[in-house]
C-alpha cells in the first residue's frame, strides 16, 4: 500500500522497538502514581486504536507515528501487566507468575487463530475491526476487576540497575531483539515468499 523498499520498511519497524524502549522505563513510575489498572486500560485502548490505523494509513510519517505509539502501548502493557501479576501473586500468597505467562502465550495463539479464521470469511480491514471490538469489550468487561494498586510514597524517576537486575535486563533485551526480528521480518517473509 505504501510502496516501501526494505530500508524504509526497516526504519518503520524500528519505530515499534523505539516506542517500547522509551515507554518501559517510565511505566513503573506511572503505575506507582496512578495505579497499574489505569495504565493497563489506557495502554490497552491506545494499542487497539492503533491496529485499524496501521491497516489503513497511507502516509509514511503517519505510519511511523502509529508504529511508535503501537510499540509504546505494548511496552506499557507488558510492564503494567507484570506489576499487576505481582500484586495478584502477593494477594494470593502463592506462586502464579508462570501460569500468567502461560496464559499470555495461549492468548496470543488464540488471537492469531481467531484472526486467521476471520480472514477466511472477511476482508482484512473488517476482520481487524471485529478483533478490536472484541478486545475492547473484554477490556471494558474485565478491566474493572484489575487491582488498582499504586504507590503512596515518592518513587525516583530512574534507578540505575545493578547486579542480577542488570543481568536480567540484558537477557530481556536480547530476547526482545530476537523476538522482534522474527515477528516482524518473519511475517513479511511468509507474505512475500510463501504467499500466506
Residue spans of the language-model regions?
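Cytoplasmic helix-loop-helix junction between adjacent transmembrane helices
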Residues: 67-102
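Short hydrophobic/small-residue motifs within alpha-helical transmembrane segments
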Residues: 17-18, 105-110
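MFS-fold secondary transporters
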Residues: 50-54, 70, 142
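Flexible interhelical linker loops that connect adjacent transmembrane helices
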Residues: 138-169
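Pair of pore-lining "gating" transmembrane helices in MFS-fold secondary transporters
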Residues: 1, 68-69, 162-178
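Short amphipathic helix-loop junctions that connect adjacent transmembrane helices
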Residues: 1-7, 184-196
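Conserved MFS/SLC helix-loop-helix module at the cytosolic interface between two early adjacent transmembrane helices
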Residues: 22-61
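Symmetry-related core transmembrane helices of the 12-TM Major Facilitator Superfamily/SLC fold
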Residues: 125-144
Amino acid at each position: 500500500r505504501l510502496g516501501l523498499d526494505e530500508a524504509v520498511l526497516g526504519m518503520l519497524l524500528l519505530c515499534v522497538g523505539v516506542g517500547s524502549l522509551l515507554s518501559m522505563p517510565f511505566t513503573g513510575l506511572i503505575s506507582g502514581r496512578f495505579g497499574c489498572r489505569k495504565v493497563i486500560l489506557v495502554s490497552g485502548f491506545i494499542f487497539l486504536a492503533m491496529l485499524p490505523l496501521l491497516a489503513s494509513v497511507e502516509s509514511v510519517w503517519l505510519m511511523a507515528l502509529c508504529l511508535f505509539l503501537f510499540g509504546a502501548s505494548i511496552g506499557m502493557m507488558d510492564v503494567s501487566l507484570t506489576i499487576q501479576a505481582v500484586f495478584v501473586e502477593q494477594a494470593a500468597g502463592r506462586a502464579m507468575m508462570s501460569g500468567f505467562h502461560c496464559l499470555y502465550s495461549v492468548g496470543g495463539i488464540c488471537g492469531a487463530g481467531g484472526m486467521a479464521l476471520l480472514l477466511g470469511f472477511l476482508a482484512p480491514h473488517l476482520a481487524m475491526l471485529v478483533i478490536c471490538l472484541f478486545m475492547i469489550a473484554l477490556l471494558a468487561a474485565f478491566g474493572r476487576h484489575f487491582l488498582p494498586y499504586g504507590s503512596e510514597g515518592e518513587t525516583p524517576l530512574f534507578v540505575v540497575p545493578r547486579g542480577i537486575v542488570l543481568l536480567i535486563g540484558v537477557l530481556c533485551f536480547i530476547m526482545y531483539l530476537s523476538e522482534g526480528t522474527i515477528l516482524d521480518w518473519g511475517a513479511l517473509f511468509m507474505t512475500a515468499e510463501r504467499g500466506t
